[in-house]
Amino acid sequence: MSELFPRRIETDRLTMLPSTPEVLSPLDFYRVCSADPDIDEVTEHLTWEPHAHPKETLEFLRATSEGLESGDDAAYQVYVDPGDAPEGVDGPSPGGPYADSDLVLAGGAGMGVDWDRRTGTLGTWLRKPFWGRGYSGERAAAFVALAFDRLDLEVVAVEHVAGNENSRRAIETYVERFGGWKEGALRNWAFEEGEPVTQHRYSIAREEYEDADVEVAVEFHG
């Protein structure tokens, strides 16, 4: 993977590892992306739908791996310690260089980087048992620090489609925490099930991040 992005990101409760076929078995990930309880609800407002077959999952992981290698997409899988996992959720765990770990997959996180615009755009998803635990904000804080402190970007942006109230609440909380604000609504900007929908956009500028002076508990390894 690109030397621009860390090989491991750690916060108080989360461990984020590169989204590659070497780290997460495509077959294990397929079982999450195709048949996890509530997967239809989880993907309702995402850019991907439940996977139809294992090859789709392999192609998904190869695409995120290529984004990491090119330096254009910091794509990670989000894990928690087994003691923090909800009852009944016991995997999957990472493999490859992390095969000795018993971490439990909670979801995914990433930041697409537009180097010409010095802008990183955040994205995330979580398996439903992990909703409502503040993980989205904790993950966001780590990526905001990654954008400004390591990658020297000038703006961090995040968007959600109209009607995604869970994302709206989480985004408004952490954007305000870092001094950012809502830029506005982009009508018919995104698509859901082939239909145009309104997209709401928020951003944090470097100056706002520095003025907010928020201490972010995160460690970047590699």
Regions inferred by a protein language model and the residue ranges of each:
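Conserved beta-strand-loop-alpha-helix junction that forms the acyl-donor binding cleft
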Residues: 158-168
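Conserved acyl-CoA
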Residues: 138-154, 177-178
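Glycine-centered recognition micro-motifs in short, flexible terminal segments and loops
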Residues: 132-138
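Conserved acetyl-CoA-binding loop of GNAT-fold acetyltransferases
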Residues: 172-186
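GNAT-family acyltransferases
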Residues: 1-132, 146, 150, 156, ...
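Short helix immediately C-terminal to the catalytic nucleophile in hydrolase catalytic domains
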Residues: 140, 167-171
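Conserved beta-strand edge residues that scaffold enzyme active sites
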Residues: 161-162, 185, 189
